[in-house]
């Protein structure tokens, strides 16, 4: 049986912790290891932070967090209706940042990819971005390869 949650919240840095805790609590149904929980929390933190800093350029907006559990697979989707990403493939390169003047390292997508089994980013300039992340638990790795991912409207990296 598929289990789902959805949370919409203000795109402010204080809510990054809320998103992490909500997904971690939801994930406990799979009896994950502490390391698995930390991995997912880190990926969620990076996706939410990207939405706040880059999607809305820290001017506020709304973020939608959706998560589902089915057959031992966690899917997390973080969506913003911000400025969007002009070149997703380039943005996903380690060390690439649009905020070179700040302390941002350009490693957000690299961390998401390191801690989750699969990451897909879809974006349209002026319309926003969705970051889809999957992680398989307890023998569900084979199932993960069977997940159908619809064709994005923009370049993707999986």
Residue ranges of each PLM-predicted region?
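Glycine-rich phosphate-binding loop
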Residues: 101-116
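A conserved short beta-strand within the histidine kinase catalytic ATPase domain
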Residues: 61-67
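Single conserved hydrophobic/aromatic residue that forms the stacking wall/gate
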Residues: 147-158
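Glycine-rich/acidic phosphate-handling loop/turn and adjacent ATP-lid/helix
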Residues: 79-103
